[in-house]
Amino acid sequence: MSRLVSLLRRRGVVLPSFEIYGGVSGLVDYGPVGARIKRRVIDAWIEHWGSITNVVEVDSPTITPEPVLIASGHVGEFNDKMSECRSCGGAFRSDHLVAEFHEAPDTLGSSELDELIERKVVRCPSCDSFDWKKAMPMNLMFQTSIGAMGGSRVAFLRPETAQGMFMLFPALYRHFRQKLPFGAMQTGKGYRNEISPRQGMIRLREFNMAELEYFIDPDDPPIDDLSKWPDRVCMIPDPDGPRPGEIEISFEEALESGIVKHPTVAWFLAMTMDFLEFVGIDRTKVRFRQHAGSEMAHYASDCWDCEI
């Protein structure tokens, strides 16, 4: 990873932000080459999903009032576990500290993380001490205020673009003449106050997002022809489910066997593979990993990560 980051920096693709003032971890600049690549990827994404006749593009604010994020669950649930070193005061994501000792450390609870840190004698990456406070949840949103002084309202920089699209649902519903299904897509900035950003661009505090929200009638879901995607892909189903482990399977077979829980999800997985191939990704380097129940986002009933 360090060699890749060094190469991207030398070639003017991605560089650390504010470097002459010491820099800030989790913030990057796109140089002349990187900005052009980013623009081409975003344009390709919009072209791909915009080709669906019942999907439109929207643009909503990055500042989100607190009530919206209370309703979505982000104020109460959008957390990572943090461990603080008593010796130097350094704060680190607890699951990152034990990543080499557990296959899925982000699924562990606070007490399990504390036990593993103690059992494996995990030392502080900054000062090499072994004196940790108990792991505790830290909300990942940047808080701000709207207005001045006593009349201000609590708000947050959006952690994702989805909430803006949900707020637009009544307008979108009217736009589509009150008929489901339909979708809205949006690109733009997202913000997450990561505890300990690392891995180059993998964990950033300000990052670019491209999201699509697709609204269906759960009692009358759209049925798409998945036979158009006969090729098998690499999938890693829920490790706690009936078929754990890596398998090669088509999207249609994955739906019929119950691995993918909904036809719309299967269709979007297939369309995602099409997009990746369109921008030049080798399909043999792609896999789809299903989230375990303990890993699932607080609002999800099924979730898949596309990993390259």
Q: Which residues fall in each region the model found?
A:
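TRNA-recognition modules of translation machinery and tRNA-sensing kinases, especially anticodon-binding
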Residues: 1-308
